[in-house]
């Protein structure tokens, strides 16, 4: 009996967006595999300081996104890396999958041109290179600088003009993300309060308590500004100025906040 072809798409999916699922659909439609497993990584060894949503939140969002694809029965979310030792390394995941499912599945890997360029730095890269077909999709402004005999470059793969980082920033700013995220994923994010402006303030406050920089105070001040908390915003901009006397951005934001605050409390009928 022939083995089923399973393509693995690894990612933090913080959060999962339409670009991710478009790649999975493309792989199915091109006949590159029978199924796609979107493997949610608990920790990327190259991004250990990256602030991640919880494992289960990210898995739940991927599960919702997979159900919204054109092939929900063939595109799945996977928690396999949650079961393994952290930080997660691709070679460990591949060996686990081979031991448990290798008798019925043949695995391949889907990754961006930015990732394959770092492949020689991965743990036991030689074993990955020798043992698996690797399909590479183009990433903006990232040339393919490394390939193997088992590498296939997918020049016609769908390209995405935004990243999860941009999605998070837009969510924290209250901007529209409907072009970027599936509706059910957006609903989940809102219900769970993920990447809200209040959450950003909490994270910035924690960073400031560990050792403040002018940039941290400016970013938190901008959050307070968007919440119309002018006094707190001004305090943060002043602290940024104290930390960096040449910080033009802090001065500009402080003056703008002070002008708004002065106008709000000015008696326009008795100037």
Residue spans of the language-model regions?
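Alpha-helical linker/edge segments of TPR/alpha-solenoid repeat scaffolds
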Residues: 197, 256-271
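Nucleotidyltransferase catalytic core that binds NTPs
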Residues: 1-200
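Conserved structural position within tetratricopeptide repeats
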Residues: 206-209, 241-242
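Short coil turns that delineate tetratricopeptide repeat
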Residues: 211-212, 245
């Amino acid at each position: 009996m022939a083995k089923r072809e399973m393509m693995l798409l690894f990612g933090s999916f913080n959060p999962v967006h339409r670009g991710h699922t478009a790649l999975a659909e493309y792989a199915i439609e091109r006949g590159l595999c029978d199924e796609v497993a979107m493997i949610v990584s608990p920790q990327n060894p190259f991004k250990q300081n990256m602030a991640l949503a919880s494992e289960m939140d990210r898995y739940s969002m991927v599960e919702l996104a997979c159900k919204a694809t054109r092939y929900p029965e063939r595109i799945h979310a996977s928690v396999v890396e949650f079961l393994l030792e952290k930080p997660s390394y691709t070679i460990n995941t591949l060996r686990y999958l081979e031991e448990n499912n290798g008798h019925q599945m043949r695995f391949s890997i889907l990754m961006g041109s930015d990732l394959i360029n770092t492949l020689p730095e991965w743990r036991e890269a030689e074993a990955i290179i020798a043992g698996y077909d690797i399909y590479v999709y183009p990433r903006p402004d990232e040339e393919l600088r490394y390939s193997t005999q088992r590498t296939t470059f997918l020049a016609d793969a769908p390209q995405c003009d935004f990243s999860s980082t941009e999605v998070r920033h837009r969510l924290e700013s209250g901007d529209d993300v409907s072009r970027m995220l599936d509706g059910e994923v957006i609903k989940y994010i809102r219900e769970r309060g993920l990447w809200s402006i209040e959450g950003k303030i909490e994270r910035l406050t924690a960073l400031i308590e560990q050792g403040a920089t002018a940039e941290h105070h400016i970013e938190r001040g901008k959050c307070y500004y968007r919440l119309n908390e002018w006094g707190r915003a001004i305090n943060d901009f002043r602290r940024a100025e104290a930390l960096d006397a040449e910080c033009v951005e802090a001065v500009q934001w402080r003056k703008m906040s002070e002008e708004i605050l002065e106008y709000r409390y000015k008696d326009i009928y008795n100037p």
